[in-house]
From Swiss-Prot:
A Pfam family assignment: Peptidase_M17_N
Signal peptide: none
One cellular-component annotation, GO: cytoplasm
Protein name: Probable cytosol aminopeptidase
HAMAP family the UniProt entry points to: Cytosol_peptidase_M17
Main location: cytoplasm
Taxonomic lineage: Bacteria, Bacillati, Mycoplasmatota, Mollicutes, Acholeplasmatales
NCBIfam families: PRK00913.1-4, PRK00913.2-2, PRK00913.2-4
Active-site residues, as the UniProt record annotates them: K268, R342
Gene name of the encoded protein: pepA
Assigned protein family: Belongs to the peptidase M17 family.
Cofactor entry: Mn(2+)
Length: 493
């Protein structure tokens, strides 16, 4: 797909489809007269009772000799309620209507509202996000949407062209995350995941890979224990984007990367086990974020740390009741081998905090089914030891439509993770609050001396999280959220 920005529409552009944006109850639409000089559209509005309500649309086909063959009118909703997210969603809703088009013109400056470059950028992003599909393994190929040419007509064309590079960077990060999560586990194991991270080096990201021998020397027995039952080797991958000042401490993002999770000896039910190929979505989000930041040359120092393992049953697999000593020196009683993500993160978080010494850490993981029970598929769970970081994440979530909801942490929950035969239990039984106790477990490896947040994305990373601008099984959730967080609160600071 090719995107262009022009200040004026010319009939010589030879487009076959035009898209016009309609503010609710507003009489006119920018560009409508240019492509519909005979006023056919307004007559159709009356017949269809189209008033420009958000999410509604009218599609008109024109006879040969008309300026365009097809006109798509998209409702933006009420004037006072329109924002960047309105344009993001409208762009996503628009894309399926363009499946037969070749050259499209979008009149992006809606009449009745103050037009801003960010609105055009969000429309373009929504359209591009919706265009993603994962069909690598289908043998019957459909039309290649990449041949589509779209020209946005806007007063801010020159500025839009400059800012579009950032949109492409974010899009690349989101789509990379989707690709990683959508890939089947027989294609994307730990070795292959490492190779994907190393491709970030072309963007200027430094990539360090810690293999099994190195992890053993570091004492990462919590992470290593999860990998015991699999023939695939474990890794810790450290990615660095150093776009800020030389002496500036980095911000860090840590991701759970279980490339397939059978549950181990505590075997999962067979129903929907195939979805466990997506249990590395936290790591995939971190990789996608690093891509986005590097591609847009973010002026900030950022670390991405991911623990890569496969959780399989086998004669050498970790057993319920095993006790392991983590890199921190704290001992962990493994009550449930299917509570493995927190074991991986325990060592990854400790390594990140003590060896890399960032000024802030955020971890992401498809950690608990309990978060889905609590929040469903609309919000990710947020846990933190820092009120300011919570405010930043909540705001970024609202702005990007990747929303987070804060849960409590505290001593009354912390004591629930005390172990019977070791310092900590990886799965407290009979207390409820499964997502909270999982977060309290992680907090044992971070403490209170560094701002930290844990985002449980089990309900939003894949499966049910489809919306106006995403039709993929994998949602790519978190890349736009964290990119906004970095840009607004940590870049150029």
């Amino acid at each position: 797909m090719k995107i262009y920005f022009k200040k004026n529409y010319l009939p010589s552009m030879d487009v076959d489809t035009a898209v016009v944006l309609q503010v609710e109850k507003y009489e006119n639409s920018f560009g409508l007269e240019a492509v519909d000089p005979k006023g056919v559209a307004k007559k159709s509005f009356l017949r269809e009772n189209f008033k420009g309500v958000f999410g509604t649309q009218v599609k008109l086909l024109y006879p040969e000799g008309s300026p365009v063959a097809c006109l798509q009118v998209m409702g933006l909703g009420k004037q006072e309620e329109i924002n960047d997210q309105t344009f993001l969603k409208t762009g996503g809703l628009c894309f399926p209507q363009l499946n037969k088009a070749n050259k499209v013109v979008v009149f992006a400056d809606a009449l009745g509202i103050e037009n801003q470059t960010s609105q055009v950028m969000h429309f373009a992003l929504g359209l591009l996000l919706r265009s993603y599909s994962f069909k690598h393994y289908h043998t019957q190929k459909t039309k290649n949407e990449k041949n589509l040419e779209i020209t946005f007509i806007t007063e801010n064309a020159e500025l839009c062209q400059k800012e579009f590079d950032d949109v492409k960077a974010i899009l690349g990060g989101v789509n990379l995350t989707k690709e990683l999560v959508n890939e089947p586990a027989n294609i994307l194991g730990t070795n292959e995941f490492v190779e994907r991270t190393q491709q970030l080096q072309t963007l200027g990201v430094e990539v360090e890979v810690l293999n099994k021998e190195t992890l053993e020397k570091l004492g990462m027995n919590a992470l290593l224990g999860v990998a015991q039952g699999s023939q695939r080797p474990p890794y810790l991958v450290v990615m660095k984007w150093l776009g800020g000042n030389e002496n500036e401490k980095p911000v860090a993002f840590v991701g759970k990367g279980v490339v397939f999770d059978t549950g181990g000896i505590s075997l999962k039910p067979s129903n929907k086990m195939e979805d466990m190929k997506g249990d590395m979505a936290g790591a995939a989000t971190v990789v996608g974020l690093m891509h986005a930041l590097a591609a847009r040359k973010a002026k900030v120092n950022v670390l991405g740390v991911i623990g890569l393992v496969e959780n399989m049953p086998g004669s050498n697999a970790q057993r319920p009741g095993d006790i392991v000593t983590s890199m921190s020196g704290q001992t962990i009683e493994v009550i449930n081998t299917d509570a493995e993500g927190r074991l991986v993160l325990a060592d990854a978080l400790w390594y990140c905090k003590t060896k890399l010494q960032p000024k802030m850490i955020i971890d992401l993981a498809t950690l608990t089914g309990a978060i889905v029970v609590a929040l469903g598929y609309e919000y990710a769970g947020l846990f933190s030891n820092n009120k300011e970081l919570v405010k930043q994440l909540v705001h970024s979530g609202e702005v990007t439509e990747e929303k987070v909801w804060q849960f409590p942490l505290g001593p009354e929950y912390d004591r629930l993770v005390d172990g019977k035969f070791a310092d900590i239990s990886n799965c407290p039984v009979g207390y409820g609050a499964g997502s909270i106790t999982a977060a309290q477990f992680l907090k044992r490896f971070v403490g209170d001396d560094i701002p930290w947040a844990h985002i449980d994305i089990a309900g939003v990373a894949s499966g049910k999280k489809k919306n106006e601008f995403n039709s993929s099984w994998a949602s790519g959730f978190g890349v736009r959220l964290l990119n906004h967080l970095v840009k607004d609160y940590y870049e150029n600071k």
